[in-house]
Amino acid sequence: MLPFPAMNLKKSRSENSSVASSGSKIEEQTEKSAEPTTIKVQKKAGTPGRSIDVFAVQCEKCMKWRKIDTQDEYEDIRSRVQEDPFFCKTKEGVSCEDVGDLNYDSSRTWVIDKPGLPRTPRGFKRSLILRKDYSKMDAYYITPTGKKLKSRNEIAAFIDANQDYKYALLGDFNFTVPKVMEETVPSGILSDRTPKPSRKVTID
């Protein structure tokens, strides 16, 4: 079984208090987990969504989750995990005999990333934001100049206008987003998302 890249989100305090035994869901942060990696999401003041602040990868052999220190390292593992599987021993001083760094449970909100996605071009940053209703994540790229780009058309236009970044290949910008694992979403959020039955008026 291929290990998946994933992300983890924590809950805000208010969410923690409203969701029983939700553990570390959004607690102002969220951790990730996925097949090869996991990500943690943190709610930032003034930000309408939640962003990832923890990355993790699952060992191909023992299936334990290992935290990944940086987004760059995480993206490197994710980009080649299909040809070069991740094992606990990949991390210096770690083996399958050691206790896992994270447990896949509802104490955190997990999002599963897609293996094989390309690394973000040098100088740019890929950002993921979790929607307030936890339905999905949105992806965008931040340029070296601090501009936020939300589509490949915007990226192409930026590179055309800024030839210093022509080294960045358009194919290395990917807007595929991780899958939010619904069983790890706070129950209070799920109930809020449940559509209410419509009231039909019958006219005799």
UniProtKB/Swiss-Prot annotation:
Keyword ATP-binding among record annotations: no
Gene3D superfamilies: 3.30.40.100, Methyl-cpg-binding Protein 2, Chain A
Source organism: Arabidopsis thaliana (Mouse-ear cress)
Bias-annotated ranges (Polar residues): 15-24
GO cellular component, one term: histone deacetylase complex
The keyword Lipoprotein is annotated on this UniProt entry: no
SMART domains listed in its UniProt record: MBD
Ranges of compositional bias, category Basic and acidic residues: 25-34
Highest taxon above the source species: Eukaryota
This protein's name: Methyl-CpG-binding domain-containing protein 1
Region (Disordered): 1-46
Notes concerning its domains: The methyl-CpG-binding domain (MBD) functions both in binding to methylated DNA and in protein interactions.
Binding site for Zn(2+): C59, C62, C88, C96
CDD domains: MeCP2_MBD (cd01396)
Motif placement: MBD-associated domain (MAD): 58-96
Main location: nucleus
UniProt entry keywords in alphabetical sequence: DNA-binding, Metal-binding, Nucleus, Transcription, Transcription regulation, Zinc, Zinc-finger
InterPro entries the record matches: DNA-bd_dom_sf (IPR016177), Methyl_CpG_DNA-bd (IPR001739), Znf_CW (IPR011124)
GO MF annotation terms: methyl-CpG binding; zinc ion binding
Compartment(s) where it occurs, according to its Swiss-Prot or TrEMBL record: Nucleus
Domain MBD span(s) in chain numbering: 110-180
Function: Probable transcriptional regulator.
Classification lineage: Eukaryota, Viridiplantae, Streptophyta, Embryophyta, Tracheophyta
